[in-house]
Amino acid sequence: MIPGQYQIQPGDIELNDGRRTLSLAVANSGDRPIQVGSHFHFFETNDALTFDRAASRGMRLNIPAGTAVRFEPGQSREVELVDLAGLRKVYGFAGRVMGDLD
């Protein structure tokens, strides 16, 4: 094996199978790029991102772990969100929840 080499089994890998998803239109109303990582609680993203924030509570981007989506100033795009799993408790980020989601 070469350092940093990926060894991936053939075929498709299903991500977040069976979890509720939601598509949202998101726009960057700010003057700087905003990048959101795969496991960031989308509800608590930068306030310059405009979208239906209430609908995104308890959700994250439905993208592979360790990746991110970048929103350039003035850019709008459709994103897919997926429910957070596990204990469904959120602490940190922007401090808007600090506890149970349900």
From Swiss-Prot:
Subcellular location: Cytoplasm
Domain of life, per lineage: Bacteria
Entry keyword Protein transport: no
Recorded GO CC terms: urease complex
Any Pfam family the entry gives: Urease_beta
E.C. code: 3.5.1.5
Pathway linked to the protein: Nitrogen metabolism; urea degradation; CO(2) and NH(3) from urea (urease route): step 1/1
Main location as per UniProt: cytoplasm
UniProt-listed Gene3D superfamilies: Urease, beta subunit
Family stated for the protein in its record: Belongs to the urease beta subunit family.
Protein name as catalogued: Urease subunit beta
Source organism per UniProt: Pseudomonas savastanoi pv. phaseolicola (strain 1448A / Race 6)
